[in-house]
Amino acid sequence: MSEIKLKYDTVIKTLDSVKDALADVSIGAAGSNGKNSLDYTKKYHEREENIKTMLGDYKKAVQKNIEDTKDNVDSLKEQDEAIAVK
């Protein structure tokens, strides 16, 4: 029978590094366009706001995945410890 070992510390360190990298994901603000009121400028700003919204949604989803993964890994560790006691 095969044996699968959980390297808990390695997994948690990797999740922490993913969390740190996620915190660095951002998009800068658009520069000033002065008094430009071109259709292109308006569409550009709308598109940029949409991208910022999508990026925020993406970050929330990744954060949720990180939390879920950590919870699952903690559960696996607890199960391994319970089995080892038997």
UniProtKB/Swiss-Prot annotation:
Superkingdom field: Bacteria
Outcome of gene disruption: Deletion of the ywqH-ywqI-ywqJ-ywqK-nfi operon has no visible phenotype, however it is out-competed by wild-type cells.
The protein's name in its UniProt record: Protein YwqI
Keywords: Coiled coil
Coiled coil start-end: 57-83
